Curated annotation (Swiss-Prot):
InterPro entries: c-SKI_SMAD4-bd_dom, DHD_Ski, DNA-bd_dom_put_sf, SAND-like_dom_sf, SKI/SNO/DAC, Ski_DNA-bd_sf, Tscrpt_reg_SKI_SnoN. Residues 493-509, 518-539 have a biased composition (Low complexity). The keyword Ubl conjugation applies. One of its GO terms (biological process) is skeletal muscle fiber development. It comes from Homo sapiens (Human). The gene is SKI. This is Ski oncogene.
Length: 728
């Protein structure tokens, strides 16, 4: 215990691990996942404190034992040397791709860059087109809720966006958002996860129950962004954007590419999503697990495959080919010739056809390619059992490649389109129309099953049982309808695909003539005529095989075994030829891709050069206009300055005369005013004289009046004085 405690006390985290954690902590601050939400430093400190306490408790001395016992020896733990410092983790340089491409988001074309396999969309273009009806506050709130973080583009990417006219030349920076986060953001803002307004429970329950119980609906689900279950109605899928899936939570109808983003449960906001594209909904929508082990699982699976194949113009979706054993069962042994007229048992009908179907369906394993439909969904957990089973089956299954690798025939050689393959135990003759007449002899089904669907060698089979005649007629009708559908689909696909493999018709026709079926059919029917366009070597080989089968091999089992060996040899030759053709097609496709990429880059460079030339012309015109205006203003100011200088010189010469004239005018005015004042003074003097004369005359008159009145006044005054004296 003490040793363990001591060893625990001296433990230190691995230097390489500690360095990795520190680098992750520093780099996560600027990563796309936002700021680091967890730091390992507090955990290390807590662990150090706990280990220090345990080491202190272990260092306490033990009690002294009895004298009979020897003193205990304290065994200290050996000091372990520090582990060697390992080199740090290998960090790949960040992908700074500057190759601009375009993608479609909610019907709008958005420019983007492919960085690390994920498309980074131009955020300003999304805000101005798809989310133009929402404010920045709403968008930021949804981004915080969904934990969506955007990155900034590099200087080269910003320059490309400016040159292409997507951003103005004055833009200082630009944000980039991944295609997955853009799908989540647009779905949350445009459609939201709100439930519809409540309605009557009885009506809603009856409608939902009626749709669920209907045989025309299929229960499906997806595991993207929190999972969602729904009901698929194949009849409603009439266009690529038709609403044909009903959500079991909100009872609303959605198109397939909208249903894979729709969810009402946990939105997986703290999950790092990568590589999601709603256009790949065919890989995300899966059949409900409620059908596991039920009878209708195969039928509903075929129905779902039919829906996924509709409107698949890019021919990206392929049916799942069932994985069965490549070796024929040990119990498959044809009956003797005397019982050939009797109708074989149902088990004997199924076993040869299943083995031949296995031989035909093994083309998927020829070049190590994995069918897109066989790959697990990007949002489902990976199971190692699947890869183990694939590895076990792959070395035993022979390869049988037909026509072009990029066509549907490479995955469905012996199966008509729109006809799903059932499990091996439940296979019937009807599921494979070309194998309908394959129950009488072993060579005949091999010839009909492995024969390509475009060119068929129509021969008479005299040894065929009469009991199969009513079954073969409707099967031939179905086969003809399937041929028409195959040819129309192939023409439409070839018209849409610009990177189709070269010389498709020639290679397919050449392989049709060299297929095992074409070789085995004359061996079963000796009276049949060889095709007119077959080469002489093929006829000789067929004749040699016919003689070997008829002469050297007596029993049917020996013939079947020999034919099986021949088919295996032929399959190996076909595999080598197919590998060579595939390599040639790959080289052609790569060359075409390089040519298209070079043409696109040249076009972009030419367009950028044209835009730069236009920008230079515009700047030159603006500069010329500004220079012209500057010259005109300079000349105008020069003229004004010259006029001012001349006016100043003229003022200096005429200043004295101007002052003299001014003063003379003032003197004249003053003289005039003085003359007026003199005239006024003379007039006033005359007026004063007249007034004096008038006053003197008046005084004279007054005196005369006084003299006339004066004598009367004296007696009256004397009388008044005497009366006054008498009164006292």
């Amino acid at each position: 215990m003490e040793a363990a405690a001591g060893g625990r006390g001296c433990f230190q985290p691995h230097p390489g691990l500690q360095k990795t954690l520190e680098q992750f902590h520093l780099s996560s601050m600027s990563s796309l996942g936002g700021p680091a939400a967890f730091s390992a430093r507090w955990a290390q400190e807590a662990y150090k404190k706990e280990s220090a306490k345990e080491a202190g408790a272990a260092a306490v001395p033990a009690p002294v034992p009895a004298a009979t016992e020897p003193p205990p020896v304290l065994h200290l733990p050996a000091i372990q040397p520090p582990p060697p410092v390992l080199p740090g983790p290998f960090f790949m340089p960040s992908d700074r791709s500057t190759e601009r491409c375009e993608t479609v988001l909610e019907g709008e074309t958005i420019s983007c860059f492919v960085v690390g396999g994920e498309k980074r969309l131009c955020l300003p273009q999304i805000l101005n087109s798809v989310l133009r009806d929402f404010s920045l506050q709403q968008i930021n709130a949804v981004c915080d809720e969904l934990h969506i973080y955007c990155s900034r583009c590099t200087a080269d990417q910003l320059e490309i966006l400016k040159v292409m006219g997507i951003l103005p030349f004055s833009a200082p920076s630009c944000g980039l958002i991944t295609k997955t986060d853009a799908e989540r953001l647009c779905n949350a803002l445009l459609y939201g996860g709100a439930y519809p307004p409540p309605c009557k429970k009885e009506l809603a329950a009856s409608l939902a129950l009626g749709l669920e119980l209907s045989e025309r609906s299929v229960r499906v689900y997806h595991e993207c962004f929190g999972k969602c279950k729904g009901l698929l109605v194949p009849e409603l899928y009439s266009s690529p954007s038709a609403a044909c899936i009903q959500c079991l939570d909100c009872r609303l109808m959605y198109p397939p590419h909208k249903f894979v983003v729709h969810s009402h449960k946990a939105l997986e906001n703290r999950t790092c999503h990568w590589g999601f594209d709603s256009a790949n909904w065919r890989a995300y929508i899966l059949l409900s697990q409620d059908y596991t082990g039920k009878e209708e699982q195969a039928r509903l699976g075929r129905c779902l495959d039919d829906v996924k194949e509709k409107f698949d113009y890019g021919n990206k979706y392929k049916r799942r080919v069932p994985r069965v054993s490549s070796e024929p069962p040990a119990s498959i042994r044809p009956k003797t010739d005397d019982t050939s007229s009797q109708s074989p048992a149902p088990s004997e009908k199924d076993k040869p056809s299943s083995w031949l179907r296995t031989l035909a369906g093994s083309s998927n394993k020829s070049l190590g390619c994995v069918h897109p439909r066989q790959r697990l969904s990007a949002f489902r957990p990976w199971s190692p059992a699947v890869s183990a089973s694939e590895k076990e089956l792959s070395p035993h299954l022979p390869a049988l490649i037909r026509d072009s690798f990029y066509s549907y025939k490479s995955f469905e050689t012996a199966v008509a389109p729109n006809v799903a393959l059932a499990p091996p135990a439940q296979q019937k003759v009807v599921s494979s129309p070309p194998c309908a007449a394959a129950v009488s002899r072993a060579p005949e089904p091999l010839a009909t099953c492995t024969q390509p669907r475009k060119r068929k060698l129509t021969v008479d089979t005299p040894g065929a049982p009469e009991t199969l005649a009513p079954v073969a007629a409707p099967e031939e009708d179905k086969d003809s309808e399937a041929e028409v559908e195959v040819e129309s689909r192939e023409e439409f696909t070839s018209s849409l695909s610009s990177l189709s493999s070269p010389s498709f018709t020639s290679s397919s026709s050449a392989k049709d003539l060299g297929s095992p079926g074409a070789r085995a059919l004359p061996s079963a029917v000796p009276d049949a005529a060889a095709p007119a366009d077959a080469p002489s070597g093929l006829e000789a080989e067929l004749e040699h095989l016919r003689q070997a089968l008829e002469g050297g091999l007596d029993t049917k089992e020996a013939k079947e075994k020999f034919l099986h060996e021949v088919v295996k040899m032929r399959v190996k030759q076909e595999e080598k030829l197919s590998a060579a053709l595939q390599a040639k097609r790959s080289l052609h496709q790569e060359l075409e891709f390089l040519r298209v990429a070079k043409k696109e880059k040249l076009r972009e460079a030419t367009e950028a050069k044209r835009n730069l030339r236009k920008e230079i012309e515009r700047l030159r015109a603006e500069n010329e206009k500004k220079m012209k205006e500057a010259n005109e203003s300079r000349l105008r100011l020069k003229r004004e300055l010259e006029q001012a200088r001349q006016a100043r010189v003229c003022d200096k010469g005429c200043e004295a005369g101007r002052l003299r004239a001014k003063y003379s005018a003032q003197i004249e005015d003053l003289q005039v005013k003085l003359q007026h004042a003199e005239a006024d003074r003379e007039q006033l003097r005359a007026d004063l004289l007249r007034e004096r004369e008038a006053r003197e005359h008046l005084e004279k008159v007054v005196k005369e009046l006084q003299e006339q009145l004066w004598p009367r006044a004296r007696p009256e005054a004397a009388g008044s004085e005497g009366a006054a004296e008498l009164e006292p």
